[in-house]
A protein has these predicted regions:
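Short loop/turn segments that flank or connect secondary-structure elements
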Residues: 1-203
Length: 203
């Protein structure tokens, strides 16, 4: 674990390698699972306020689900999340001609129609945040549908925390990310020095 103020970052977040391979998985994380995207309380009002600008990007079935269930729902974990279409994909999901899932909210953001990119939990994935009384814990969420992302991460040599750099800065700020990155780099240098010392001792 790495601790930065009241944030605890699991070792897997900095050690495991990951890079989304959207061509391979087709955005399965937006489709699979029992719940929609976790939402922060502040995001509930945001979704309400941007809905009319996001709506033109959504599928008819997504619009129907949102207007029947609400822009957000209180799920069985007693937390807020995005609504689902027929208990499957997120209601804000769109699909391109290749069947790849995209985020309608992010499409509206990319077009310059809104300032909100997408729920921060989506932006941070595969990191999931658990909030406790005094700390927030950042964990790496392993999911078999992301096996291609793990392989691509190894190929590119990108650890989880670097892959979600923009999201971490969005959530916690530039200083938090730079501190985390410095700690990781320093740890790597120390480990490399230890290996070199061991090699010298063997010689």
């Amino acid at each position: 674990m790495i601790q930065i103020e009241d944030k605890l970052i699991s070792a897997e977040v900095v050690e495991e390698l990951f890079h989304c391979d959207i061509i391979a998985c087709k955005g399965a994380c937006c489709v699979e699972g029992d719940l929609g995207a976790p939402l922060e309380i502040a995001e509930l009002d945001i979704l309400d306020s941007i809905y009319e600008k996001v709506k033109p990007y959504l599928r008819p079935e997504g619009i129907a689900a949102i207007e029947a269930q609400g822009k957000s729902v209180l799920d069985f974990t007693h937390s807020y999340s995005t609504p689902l279409v027929n208990e499957k994909e997120c209601a804000y999901v769109t699909f391109d001609e290749k069947g790849i899932a995209n985020c309608g909210i992010e499409q509206a953001w990319s077009a310059g129609d809104i300032a909100f990119r997408k729920p921060v939990s989506c932006h941070l994935y595969p990191i999931r945040i658990r909030e406790y009384r005094d700390v927030e814990v950042l964990n790496y969420d392993r999911w078999d549908i992301c096996s291609a992302a793990c392989s691509l991460g190894v190929k590119k040599g990108i650890p989880v925390y670097e892959f979600v750099k923009d999201a971490l800065i969005r959530k916690y700020g530039e200083e938090f990310y730079e501190t985390l990155d410095s700690i990781v780099k320093e740890k790597m240098l120390m480990e490399q020095q230890d290996w070199e010392d061991e090699d010298n001792d063997e010689d």
